[in-house]
């Protein structure tokens, strides 16, 4: 059986240079794909880049977490379509 982690936040690991060891541990545990969840425009580009670099193992979503909604929420929402991707 192949497992998918359907909700994780990988940006902190990437920022600390720890992404590859995290992916190695996930694979060793039987997790074949991770879906990293974008919560604000501040992480959307990072997650798209992770997906492009690790297409077989990382997918991503973009959205606004209620804690990150501010006065510019409409501008953020208007950017969402630039992050659409075909299904993996």
Can you say where each PLM-predicted feature lies in the sequence?
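Mid-domain alpha/beta scaffold segments of enzyme catalytic cores
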Residues: 1-88
């Amino acid at each position: 059986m192949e497992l998918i982690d359907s909700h994780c936040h990988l940006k902190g690991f990437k920022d600390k240079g720890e992404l590859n060891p995290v992916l190695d541990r996930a694979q060793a545990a039987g997790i074949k794909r991770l879906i990293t969840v974008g919560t604000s425009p501040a992480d959307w580009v990072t997650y798209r880049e992770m997906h492009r670099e690790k297409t077989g193992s990382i997918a991503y979503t973009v959205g606004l977490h209620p804690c990150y909604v501010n006065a510019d929420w409409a501008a953020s929402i208007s950017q969402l379509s630039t992050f659409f991707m075909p299904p993996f």
